[in-house]
């Protein structure tokens, strides 16, 4: 028999949203993916990890599931970098017949700073400072204290889905969403 290990190293970080009603509006789906990207990046930074692989998961109304992944040239913990990849993968993905039933973002190939992560020559050490500052604001004032404007729904029609419309899977924040 194998020994039970109560704590084990994370192999991936991700979150998924299952919709009660299928989503056919690609802009609404894009906003959901952006929110998930920020959640994943914040969890990476909180765990002092960087990722090498970004994965997009989509399930259609007929329950057909498609995953697309891309390996990054440089490991990252920044939502901006992860979003560029998620957005590119999503743009190449057609809307399934009947719409999306589930969308998810996952990052894999996790590395710790002591794993010898190589930085780019000439990389600005301040890069990512704004995301780390936003993390500090959210820790102090709650997860809804600060968000990208596109997640606020200020008249663009791309509002964050009300809590009753979705079921989230993934590690939740201390507020218990």
Residue ranges of each PLM-predicted region?
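Acidic, metal-coordinating catalytic segment for phosphate/diphosphate chemistry
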Residues: 74-177
């Amino acid at each position: 028999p194998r020994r039970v290990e109560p704590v084990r190293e994370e192999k991936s970080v991700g979150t998924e949203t299952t919709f009660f009603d299928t989503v056919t509006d690609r802009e609404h789906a894009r906003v959901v993916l952006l929110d998930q990207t920020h959640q994943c990046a914040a969890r990476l930074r909180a765990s002092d990890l960087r990722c090498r692989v970004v994965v997009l998961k989509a399930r259609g109304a007929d329950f057909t599931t498609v995953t697309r992944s891309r390996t990054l040239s440089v490991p990252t913990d920044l939502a901006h970098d992860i979003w560029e990849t998620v957005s590119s993968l999503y743009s190449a993905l057609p809307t399934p017949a009947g719409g999306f039933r589930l969308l998810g973002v996952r990052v894999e190939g996790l590395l710790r700073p002591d794993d010898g992560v190589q930085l780019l020559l000439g990389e600005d050490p301040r890069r990512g400072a704004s995301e780390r500052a936003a993390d500090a604001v959210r820790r102090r004032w709650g997860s809804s204290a600060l968000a990208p404007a596109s997640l606020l729904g200020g008249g663009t029609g791309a509002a964050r889905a009300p809590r009753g419309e979705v079921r989230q899977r993934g590690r939740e924040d201390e507020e218990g969403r």
